[in-house]
């Protein structure tokens, strides 16, 4: 189900141990610490391999996340805002990642720009609670979604390159 490249990426992202969501205030801080450590490691690995593709930050409570992701296509960088909330039932429930500016531009998206992850990602997430976290959601959810959807949207002329 998972190809060698994805397996290698996953093996380099630390697994999380604390089973806590935003409702468990006393141990949520520990879970957030693990989330940040995994994200930092994932971003470092991406930079070292020349595949740096996103930046994220959160509100003080760690319940709202936002940032930018980008996809390179024909040597052009397509950049998008990305956002998601941590569900109250996290980590049992995976975050629903949204790319708001692409809302309504592809069938593989729900209202509000939330990307469709039900068939491939959510069963994998469910088997790996609480070990998977935000870095895993980015690697197994958003990254493959961008890799499939962005070239298709470009080829169909639905999105076009914007000069900076």
UniProtKB/Swiss-Prot annotation:
Residues annotated as the enzyme's active site? 116 (glycyl thioester intermediate)
For this UniProt entry, the molecular function terms from Gene Ontology, in alphabetical order, are: UFM1 conjugating enzyme activity
- Family matches, as InterPro entries: UBQ-conjugating_enzyme/RWD, Ufc1
Keywords, ordered alphabetically: Ubl conjugation pathway
- Statement: the UniProt record of this protein carries the keyword Transmembrane: no
- One GO term of the biological process aspect: protein K69-linked ufmylation
Task: Identify one Gene Ontology CC term for this UniProt entry.
Answer: cytoplasm
**Coiled-coil segments, which residues?**
none
Q: Which family does it belong to?
A: Belongs to the ubiquitin-conjugating enzyme family. UFC1 subfamily.
What's this protein's function? E2-like enzyme which forms an intermediate with UFM1 via a thioester linkage.
Any idea what this protein is called?
A: Ubiquitin-fold modifier-conjugating enzyme 1
């Amino acid at each position: 189900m998972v190809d060698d490249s994805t397996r290698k990426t996953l093996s380099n992202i630390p697994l999380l141990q604390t089973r806590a969501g935003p409702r468990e205030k006393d141990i949520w801080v520990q879970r957030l610490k693990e989330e940040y450590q995994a994200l930092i490691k994932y971003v470092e690995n991406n930079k070292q391999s020349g595949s740096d593709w996103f930046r994220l930050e959160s509100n003080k409570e760690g319940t709202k996340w936002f940032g930018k992701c980008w996809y390179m296509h024909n040597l052009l960088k397509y950049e998008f805002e990305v956002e998601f909330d941590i569900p109250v039932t996290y980590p049992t429930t995976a975050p629903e990642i949204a790319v708001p500016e692409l809302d309504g531009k592809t069938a593989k998206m729900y209202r509000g720009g939330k990307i469709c992850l039900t068939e491939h990602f959510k069963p994998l997430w469910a088997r790996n609670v609480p070990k998977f976290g935000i870095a895993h959601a980015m690697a197994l959810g958003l990254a493959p979604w961008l890799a499939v959807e962005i070239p298709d949207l470009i080829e169909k002329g639905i999105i076009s390159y914007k000069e900076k």
